[in-house]
């Protein structure tokens, strides 16, 4: 039964994460007629609550990974299980940055589901205070200006790219197709949210890991260490 209450990330655990990953993969495989997703079989009070989530697809090749799609929802328009299914299908087939996923790629795709809290606008008298208020490793950001400009970056992104708070703000502005210093404009709305990440350890595997954004390692540091 659908519940109007919004799921809280504190309610989530590894088993819920495993179910979300399973739903996401079945949703993608269904498009290739390799599986059938029946959401009614996922009768769980947490999954039946309305939720916000993003699904990220990574393609593994030669021991390296690259982004293959990422789509999500920041409005509580459906139960969490439906959001996971819809976001997975959109990430696989409707991300405008990539060609639609092909069936022969599935064996090399790792699925990641990030469940979000409801975004809250950050209001400050002095816009220069924004870098002092946001927290890299904890906050995700949304930048909005009018109805034409909107950009979102998940909490794990600044950790992966070793950004400080000001760079994080600038990159979110760029994601919204605005100037990097748009966050200083009082007509621009800045929102933040938190998230918890569930990720497959290998493609189509039953093992998953639960990740806090603050635990994400900087990719640049990894590259330097591997030199």
Curated annotation (Swiss-Prot):
<dbReference type="InterPro" id="IPR002733">
    <property type="entry name" value="AMMECR1_domain"/>
</dbReference>
<dbReference type="InterPro" id="IPR023472">
    <property type="entry name" value="Uncharacterised_MJ0810"/>
</dbReference>
<feature type="domain" description="AMMECR1">
    <location>
        <begin position="15"/>
        <end position="209"/>
    </location>
</feature>
<dbReference type="InterPro" id="IPR027485">
    <property type="entry name" value="AMMECR1_N"/>
</dbReference>
<dbReference type="InterPro" id="IPR023473">
    <property type="entry name" value="AMMECR1"/>
</dbReference>
<dbReference type="InterPro" id="IPR036071">
    <property type="entry name" value="AMMECR1_dom_sf"/>
</dbReference>
<protein>
    <recommendedName>
        <fullName>Protein SSO0193</fullName>
    </recommendedName>
</protein>
<dbReference type="Pfam" id="PF01871">
    <property type="entry name" value="AMMECR1"/>
</dbReference>
<dbReference type="InterPro" id="IPR027623">
    <property type="entry name" value="AmmeMemoSam_A"/>
</dbReference>
